[in-house]
Amino acid sequence: MAKIIGISGGSGSGKTTVVSKISEFIPEFVLISQDNYYKSVGDYEHEFSKVNFDHPDAFDNNLFYEHLKNLKKNSPIDMPLYDFINHKRQLKTVLVVPTPVVIVEGIMIFVEERVRNLIDLKIYIDTPNDIRFIRRLRRDISKRGRTVESVIDQYLNTTRWGYYRFIEPTKEYADLIIPEGGHNDKALYVLSTFLKSLSKEGLDFT
């Protein structure tokens, strides 16, 4: 069975940077982003401005769970791709062939117990709110076609609330908490040393 490493934390916490660091010590893995499992805005009965993307129900949780379960059993999946400009799932998918290690990252991957039970190593990135907001603002404007006003409005109305209601409480499930994300050199050194030892021992997380 494949080993799954889960990386969670608030939006803009530095999950991608930590994934990049892990890639230096685990040469072969597949990356699954929970973002690709957002539901299309067209699946909602109400207008886009009222859609809460910072709620667990914003994700296709059943498909996400089934795909992780299949990868853990070394079965390939057709991973969806989400279009953040048009806020809908693309028609095309990506064939993901499992490797001995699967890295999954997302803001709410530790919320559901059934998903947590599939993850062998749970890492939580704990980054200050102001830093996360600035990173999110820059990302959403440059990569997702958002305006400054829309990002601020979303943060004040749903993102901040969703973080404290759903995301931060999942720290209790983490095996490792990394303050400051990818900029915490000491924590990343500890993580890299741990992963090196696991690699030598055949990646047994038990």
Swiss-Prot record:
This protein's UniProt keywords: ATP-binding, Cytoplasm, Kinase, Nucleotide-binding, Transferase
GO molecular function, one term: uridine kinase activity
Recorded superkingdom: Bacteria
GO CC terms: cytoplasm
EC number: 2.7.1.48
Transmembrane segments: none
Pfam families, per the entry: PRK
The protein's annotated pathway: Pyrimidine metabolism; CTP biosynthesis via salvage pathway; CTP from cytidine: step 1/3; Pyrimidine metabolism; UMP biosynthesis via salvage pathway; UMP from uridine: step 1/1
Disulfide bonds: none
Catalytic activity: uridine + ATP = UMP + ADP + H(+); cytidine + ATP = CMP + ADP + H(+)
Biological processes annotated in GO: CTP salvage; UMP salvage
Cellular location(s): Cytoplasm
Residues that bind ATP: G9, G10, S11, G12, S13, G14, K15, T16
Family listed: Belongs to the uridine kinase family.
Subunit structure of this chain's protein: Monomer.
Protein name per Swiss-Prot or TrEMBL: Uridine kinase
Native species: Borreliella burgdorferi (strain ATCC 35210 / DSM 4680 / CIP 102532 / B31) (Borrelia burgdorferi)
